[in-house]
Amino acid sequence: MDSLKSGLATAGKFTYKGTKTVAKAGYNTSKKHMHKKDKDTHHTDHHEEDEYSEDYHTPRSVNTLRDPSSFPPPPTRSGQAGHVAGNTAGSIAGNYSGYSQPTAAANNTISYNAQAQNTPYSSPAQQQPVSPQPPVQNSQYNPTQNYAIQQPQQPAGTNANYSYGNQQHPAGQAPIVNSITPNHQYNANNTFQSNLPNQQLNVAAPTQSTNNNFNQMAANNTYTNSAQVAYNSQQQQLQQNSQQNTYSNAPYQVQAQAAYNPLPQQQQQQQQQPEYNTQLQQNQQLHNQQAYGQQQQIYSNNTQPQYVSQTQQTSYTQNAPPQQTRSPEQPVYGQGITPPVQANAYRPMPSIPPDVNQTAITSTNSANEALQNRIPMNNVDLSSLPPPPTHRDRGRASVENETIDENMQTNNSTIDSSSVASADINNNSIRNIPAPAVGPPGAATRAVPPPPPRRTTSQSMSTNSVVETSPGINSIEQINNYYDGTYAGHSANERPPITNTLKRGTPPLPRRSTSTKMNTQPNPQTPISPSRDTNMDLQRRSTVSSIQSSNRPMPDPPIRKDNIQENNIESKQVNQEVNSQMSVSNIGIGDITSELQHIKLKSVGNSYEREIHGEAATEVVHNKPLKKKPPTVPKKKDSLKGKAPPPVPKKKPTLTSFVHS
């Protein structure tokens, strides 16, 4: 452990070398631990691990000891990265200049750079920032100018106004003070920052634009009227606005000159509005001291509680260049419109770290609103959302589909077999489950003619007869396919039990004995076709076992042909008898099956003869049972007459052989 500790100690100093030592030390200590585990119990290991974990976690606690207020605030927007450094120097009373500057506007700390330089003018600045400069109408303002430079020139209040028309100082105050104050504030800063005349000139230009905008707003009586309501000195402010009109109309030079004569104008303002300034100073000082522990210009609750959050607004707006915050030609209040309550109140704070200074809000009136503004809450109306699905909803889709199926079945009862087949397919697709072999009542018409390649002659005839005899059965084809292993495209292993198909109160399946009579007619072609009846399959199995055990010689082909013909004749006769007894019109299906019989007999007979003569040599072993079948079939037929259908066969032994042939 000592080596580990030393390695950790050196890791920070030597970087790569230190990490190497740590790795080596860890490797060596792990070796020791491995050897100790063999001898000792795990107590020592746990003890050492605990020590190591303690040492390892202790440095993390050091981070908790640091005061986050010691760090400068991160830049809130991309354009302000340069300003952060200045903010740290100018931060007042431990407030980050970036944060305090909303209040910093009162502090004359320039909206971007809170500079101590502005502080001597803090009292006039506090008075002055009341004039919200309408968002600098960018007509004269150059976006390229650095805010870091310009705004330090402007007292914070003016900068807040200048950078953001958003910051809406109390309505009456703002317009008038704006017209004069931008000059005064610039003047105050200029006098203080006389070393920056050029920059001041640059700043003056935006003031002109702001003044022009402001004058426009003043021309709109709505803006000035609100100001009048708010302040007694409105008329003076209007006069000042008219004065500013001269300035604003004048070229930059005039304003610059005015800026260099800051004190007299500021004094004029103070004289013109002594009441307002005194109230602002007192209220602002109280609020600033309470909330921020600083004197920062906060718009007094008395004058306009609405705009108490202007400091907040300034905090939003000061942190970003004015162009970003507002499009030009949008005065903070909208041109000629009474300032909305807390225009910036609903903007989310971008990325300002939480600070006690910010949570403390300037006025009790806007405290709740300000908190809501600073903490963006995404309120989701859960009532608008649909209720979550429950287990009860699981079967609803299938239940609805069942009703659909019943409707389709009733409609299909009058439709021919081809349309019924398509409807049956549609029903199955709707349910997304394999169609049961037996359907609900009224589905007898669903019986689909068996696919020609899958059905032997006797089977197709028998299925037709059975379908008409039992009106409640969904489709005998499905039942036969079930026994064949071709049920609904599923493999033999996936077949659903046929008992499920009898659930809906349908009449029971017809006794299989009648079909066994028909199907058990020794039809030698059936074993060859890939799909075959169950009885024939059992016969084939029995013959396979008997033939393989005795290895009897194969019968001659002519005997087999005779048997084939005889068996076919018998099966035809039986099927015709059954159909005549049922007296059911089976014309279309009967015609098709009769044609299929002839086609199938030829193809099956040819393939069978080829295999007998050994043309398919590889298949001889598999086909032996088939060859020996015809003589044995009649015996098995008698034994199977009265018996119930045997269980479903799981394998089709002869199917693979015919794939090759």
UniProtKB/Swiss-Prot annotation:
GO CC aspect terms: actin cortical patch; membrane raft
Lineage of the organism: Eukaryota, Fungi, Dikarya, Ascomycota, Saccharomycotina
Ranges of Basic and acidic residues composition bias in the record: 37-58, 390-399
Protein name (database record): Altered inheritance of mitochondria protein 3-1
Entry membrane topology: Peripheral membrane protein
Pfam family name, one: AIM3
Region of interest (Disordered), ranges: 19-99, 116-142, 154-194, 263-419, 431-473, 487-563, 615-661
Keywords: Membrane
Main location: membrane
Polar residues composition-biased segments: 319-328, 356-371, 406-419, 458-473, 512-533, 541-552
Cell compartments where the protein resides: Membrane raft
Family statement drawn from the similarity comment of this UniProt entry: Belongs to the AIM3 family.
Any one biological process term the GO annotation gives: barbed-end actin filament capping
Residue stretches of biased makeup (Low complexity): 120-142, 263-318, 434-447
